[in-house]
Amino acid sequence: MTSTACPDVKPNAAPGLRLVGSMNRMWDVDRQCAALGLAPHSTSPPDDAGAEEPTLLLAGPATIETIRHSLTPPYAGFLEIGSDGLTGIGQRCIETVRAGGMTLSLTATSACTVPLVELIAVAIRRRLALATGENAELMEICLAEAVSNAIIHGNLEIPNHLRATPKGFDTFRQVMRERLSDPVMASRRIEIHVLARQPGSFTLAVSDQGPGFDLAAQIKKEARADARSGRGLGLIRRACATIESEDGGRTLVMTFPWESATEGS
């Protein structure tokens, strides 16, 4: 099956954003930045980010330290640099940061080798001053389910039912190794976007580059009494204020109540 990419970024989509990081000279970084609507890239952040300085996105190899650093101000997120540079970055990444949110774009391989959910959950709690408690815990559980679905069922296209039995789980592990050895599937991106849209709530969107799925049909299927496998969408639906799918089922958008630690004290 051919790869279905996240929507391409439109030219000049987000002026006022700058990419920071060491880039491969084999491709024209600044031309790719311009195509994304980014200011010319820089190898390091400005010494003194004033009011006129653009919002910063960190780019480079996906390591725990670079991702953690990218989720800490002055940065607004991380874009993993692939073999083709910035090609394939989804439009939602740029739009989210432009709107004041936080974003990440990683390949499936990298997403399987770093504690992605933990890194994102910590950053969300810190950036939104999210109060600890049940809501924060449910958010992290939903994030874990959505990320797992995006990687396994979306980008790697591994069926739900394989993990339903011990024998099936052995097959699942073998198939996963094979899919991650496939350069096309392994390079598909998972993208995570966090945005406080209105007082009292924030959205968490997880995008993949797989074939997509029918959210309503999948929720109905998992609700059956004899269902033995699924994507955990019933749990997500119960934990979220709202749940929607976009981009032909390749993006899951979850809305959560937002109570800051200050408000809850």
What are these regions (language model features)?
Residues E140-L143, A205:
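Short, conserved beta-strand edge motifs with alternating hydrophobic and charged residues
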Residues M1-P46:
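Short, charged N-terminal beta->alpha structural module
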Residues R31, R68-L71, Q218:
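Short amphipathic alpha-helical segments
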Residues G50-I141, I152, L156-F169, R173-R177:
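Bergerat-fold GHKL ATPase/HATPase_c domain
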Residues N24-R25, S110-C112, Q198-G200, S260:
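Residues that cap or initiate secondary-structure elements
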Residues E145, N149:
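Conserved polar catalytic motif of the HATPase_c/GHKL fold
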Residues E95-G101, I152-S265:
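Conserved beta-strand-loop-beta-strand hairpin that lines the nucleotide-binding pocket
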